[in-house]
């Protein structure tokens, strides 16, 4: 009876070891793959309103990034960047946000259809040697929550 039981236990242990090895090897393969590239920031509606919550002690850095973004759009040779600049306004709210964060409101209307509004992509086009430092300052400036995006569709133009 013991002889009949031992081969069954060995088989079960063998199957468990095989399963564990398969899992470990699979995890290693998944880990070794390249990270997917970020999707472009393309607005789905006629325009967008973006609220950014910026840490109070990083306001100067964020203001600098917005200035660099304006410069990047202005000096770009791409026609869609000129169109983006023409319809993109950034405001700073007088009221504080969560945890005392400064609130920045970007209004993009009309949005350029199919254009990528990723700030770091635009900065990288204009300032390739500075982009790592700019990205670091940009990323570190956000509070929690970092912001909120609203894709907007025109309901009524009161002037028409």
Q: Whereabouts are the PLM-identified features?
A:
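An amphipathic, aromatic/His-enriched active-site/gating alpha helix that lines ligand/cofactor pockets
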Residues: 34, 70-86, 98-101, 107-160
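Weak global preference for isoleucine
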Residues: 24, 42, 51, 65-66, ...
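Generic detector of low-complexity/intrinsically disordered segments
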Residues: 7, 20-23, 151-152, 156-157
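Bacterial N-terminal signal peptides
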Residues: 12-26
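N-terminal secretory signal peptides
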Residues: 34-94
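Boundary at the C-terminal end of the N-terminal hydrophobic targeting segment
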Residues: 27-34
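N-terminal secretory signal peptides that target proteins for export/translocation
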Residues: 1-11
């Amino acid at each position: 009876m013991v002889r009949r039981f031992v081969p069954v236990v060995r088989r079960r242990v063998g199957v468990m070891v095989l399963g564990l090895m398969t899992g470990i090897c699979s995890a290693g393969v998944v880990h070794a793959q390249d990270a997917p590239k970020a999707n472009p920031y393309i607005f789905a509606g006629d325009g967008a309103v973006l609220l950014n919550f910026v840490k109070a002690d990083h306001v100067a850095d964020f203001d600098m990034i917005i200035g660099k973004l304006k410069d990047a759009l202005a000096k770009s040779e791409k026609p869609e960047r000129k169109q983006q600049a023409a319809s993109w306004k950034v405001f700073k709210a007088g009221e504080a946000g969560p945890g005392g964060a400064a609130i920045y409101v970007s209004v993009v209307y009309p949005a350029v259809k199919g254009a990528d509004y990723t700030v770091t992509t635009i900065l990288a086009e204009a300032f390739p040697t500075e982009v790592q430092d700019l990205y670091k300052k940009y990323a570190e400036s956000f509070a929690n929550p970092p912001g909120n995006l609203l894709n907007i569709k025109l309901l009524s133009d009161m002037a028409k």
